[in-house]
């Protein structure tokens, strides 16, 4: 049976819980099996059924659409950025990659594919991009 995106997100976060902190108080968080992410001050966030977690502390309007992220994915998949992604993977130090403004995650996925020992973490304020990931 294939696991849902939500369950995969929870399992991935539990496996790398030391890299996450509460966006409100900066304390370490616990990732519970039910998808609740909570800190010692009881700030809590829930993993969405689509397999992402919203750590934003206030609503943000994004001007990016699903169509934009689909087009972005197509361009990145065309190979246009292959050499750049390979070079970034070569230059990177450490086992974690943080891609801020990751969109649908195409760049990060291709960089991490060149570094199988590494873990990629992508964040973006555009919900459409994160859902597409």
Question: What do these predicted regions represent?
Answer:
Residues 94-103:
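Conserved class I S-adenosyl-L-methionine
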Residues 62-83, 87:
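Class I SAM-dependent methyltransferase Rossmann-like catalytic core
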Residues 133:
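Conserved SAM-binding loop
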Residues 2-62:
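N-terminal auxiliary segments of SAM/dcSAM-dependent transferases
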Residues 104-116:
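Conserved SAM-binding loop of SAM-dependent methyltransferases across substrates and taxa
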Residues 87-93:
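Glycine-rich helix-loop-beta junction characteristic of Rossmann-like nucleotide cofactor-binding loops
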Residues 124-128:
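Conserved SAM/SAH-binding beta-strand->alpha-helix loop
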Residues 118-121:
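Short beta-strand element of Class I
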């Amino acid at each position: 049976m294939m696991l849902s995106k939500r369950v995969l997100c929870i399992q991935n976060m539990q496996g790398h819980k030391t890299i996450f902190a509460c966006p409100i108080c900066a304390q370490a968080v616990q990732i519970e099996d039910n998808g609740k992410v909570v800190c010692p001050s009881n700030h809590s966030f829930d993993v969405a059924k689509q397999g992402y977690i919203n750590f934003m502390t206030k609503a943000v309007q994004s001007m990016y659409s699903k169509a934009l992220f689909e087009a972005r994915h197509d361009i990145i998949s065309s190979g246009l950025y292959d050499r750049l992604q390979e070079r970034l993977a070569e230059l990177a130090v450490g086992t974690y990659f943080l891609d801020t403004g990751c969109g649908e995650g195409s760049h990060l996925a291709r960089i991490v594919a060149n570094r199988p020992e590494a873990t990629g973490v992508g964040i973006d304020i555009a919900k459409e991009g994160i859902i597409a990931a």
